[in-house]
From Swiss-Prot:
Compartment annotation: Cytoplasm
Principal location class: cytoplasm
Stored Pfam families: KH_6, RRP4_S1
Organism: Ignisphaera aggregans (strain DSM 17230 / JCM 13409 / AQ1.S1)
Function: Non-catalytic component of the exosome, which is a complex involved in RNA degradation. Increases the RNA binding and the efficiency of RNA degradation. Confers strong poly(A) specificity to the exosome.
GO MF, one example: poly(A) binding
Assembly notes: Component of the archaeal exosome complex. Forms a trimer of Rrp4 and/or Csl4 subunits. The trimer associates with a hexameric ring-like arrangement composed of 3 Rrp41-Rrp42 heterodimers.
PROSITE patterns assigned: S1
Domain of life: Archaea
Protein name as it appears in the record: Exosome complex component Rrp4
Gene name of the record: rrp4
Alphabetical keyword list: Cytoplasm, Exosome, RNA-binding
Span of domain S1 motif: 80-153
Gene3D superfamilies reported for this sequence: K Homology domain, type 1, Nucleic acid-binding proteins
A GO cellular component entry from the record: exosome (RNase complex)
Length: 253
């Protein structure tokens, strides 16, 4: 174990930590309660990293907020997360959904339909079958029972078109970027509609197969280079080069 240099409000660069690294964090730095799970508090200012991650900062209301971006790990559901799931089993009144996690989730027919459901008079398989893809939100999560999904919100429900790809769930933050900078750039450069689930699944709806292929290449490049700096601009240049190579553009204005 070795100790990283002290982190202060003036720190602007990302810092890579691995399990066991000791990090000095000023008390005036705000730490997200959900991300404090990744850091073991040794004393008032000293934390021990429990994972491989990037430590980064963002300014919110004149305060410095610490962001912990895991680089390894599986998806653990959190209430409010948007996830992209695949139906893997059907019961009389619910679907069992694989959300790319150690936990299978449940989507109740009454929630999906927005009304009461009677399995004696209605066939649940009319609505969703094994293999169907669903965008849902984690409504509740109890580790002893697993997460419950809801689709009662705008943009949620069965996916009827597009392509589905997967990345490591802990790389999702890099695909989205600060204030959605990376995601907005991907959408602008590829003209694809891109939906990123917190569980590492992504749905692409693109104008043509070539732009879809470029978008997939770019996302996979982000995944493999998530630990590096200057990534957004590098990915933008990569997409432009790929479009030129395929004759989609001659030059970039």
């Amino acid at each position: 174990m070795y100790e990283k240099e002290a982190i202060s409000l003036q720190t602007s660069k990302r810092i890579l930590v691995v399990p066991g690294d000791s990090v000095q964090i000023s008390q005036d730095v705000v730490i997200d309660p959900q991300q404090i799970l990744y850091l073991y508090k040794k004393d008032d200012n000293t934390f021990i990293s429990t994972i491989t991650a990037l430590l980064d900062f963002e300014n919110i209301d004149d305060k410095k907020k610490l962001r912990v971006i895991p680089l390894k790990g599986r998806y653990i559901p959190r209430e409010g997360d948007i996830v992209i799931g695949i139906v893997v089993d059907v019961t009389l009144s619910s679907w069992i959904i694989d959300i790319n996690s150690p936990y299978l989730s449940v989507l109740n027919a009454s929630d999906y339909l927005g009304r009461s459901f009677n399995p004696l008079t209605d066939n649940i398989r009319k609505y969703l079958e094994i293999g169907d893809v669903v965008v849902g939100k984690i409504a509740t999560f109890d580790r002893s029972r697993g997460p419950i999904l809801t689709v009662q919100d705008k943009g949620l429900g069965k996916v009827v078109d597009g392509s589905l790809i997967e990345i490591e769930p802990i790389k999702v933050a890099r695909v989205i970027g600060k204030k959605k900078s990376m995601l907005n750039m991907l959408i602008e450069q590829t003209k694809c509609d891109i939906l990123v689930g917190n569980n590492g699944r992504i749905i692409l709806r693109c104008p043509n197969p070539e732009l879809e292929y470029i978008a997939i290449l770019a996302i996979k490049k982000i995944e493999s280079e998530a630990h590096t700096t200057g990534l957004t601009e590098r990915i933008r240049e990569f997409i432009i080069e790929e479009k030129v190579k395929r004759g989609l553009i001659k030059y970039e204005v």
